[in-house]
């Protein structure tokens, strides 16, 4: 959260190469599982859940795992949706990390494929613009359907601004 991604690219790449994950899907997915901002949003949401609610479940005989899945998860779907949207948009638009770890042309992300248009002679601006529009469609569709959760999640996570 405090350290920019560019500062940790080299150590992360060395880690991925030691695990022999370069040019594989885990190299894209695993580094993004526990991002600091996502943990911060979950922490702010979960600390505001009333203790009375959890105590009532405990008094009713609910185990901690059942309390989590029956009470905490349903009331926290807005923060889950918000984290999903923010992480999806960040990873969908990410260029530098996939550029480092995905070496094969068959496993390129959409941003790497768009960048490959710039290396051709002559530059086909119509193809570039069409690919950029196509790359934006999934984010627009997702935001239209999840806008309610996004706004509620930002409001309930404690981010002021």
Question: Where in the sequence are the language-model features?
Answer:
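A hydrophobic, multi-pass inner-membrane permease signature
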Residues: 1-161
């Amino acid at each position: 959260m405090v350290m920019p991604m560019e500062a940790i690219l080299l150590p992360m790449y060395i880690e991925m190469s030691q695990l022999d994950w370069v040019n594989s899907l885990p190299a894209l997915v695993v580094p993004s599982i526990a991002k600091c901002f996502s943990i911060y949003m979950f922490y702010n949401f979960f600390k505001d859940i009333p203790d009375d609610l959890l105590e009532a479940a405990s008094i009713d005989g609910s185990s901690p795992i059942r309390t989590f899945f029956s009470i905490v998860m349903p009331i926290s779907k807005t923060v889950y949706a918000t984290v999903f949207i923010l992480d999806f948009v960040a990873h969908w638009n990410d260029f530098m990390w996939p550029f480092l770890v995905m070496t094969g042309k068959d496993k390129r992300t959409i941003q790497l494929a768009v960048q490959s248009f710039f290396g051709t002679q002559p530059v086909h601006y119509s193809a570039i613009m069409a690919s950029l529009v196509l790359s934006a469609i999934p984010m627009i569709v997702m935001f239209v359907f999840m806008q309610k959760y996004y706004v509620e999640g930002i409001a309930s996570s404690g981010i002021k601004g």
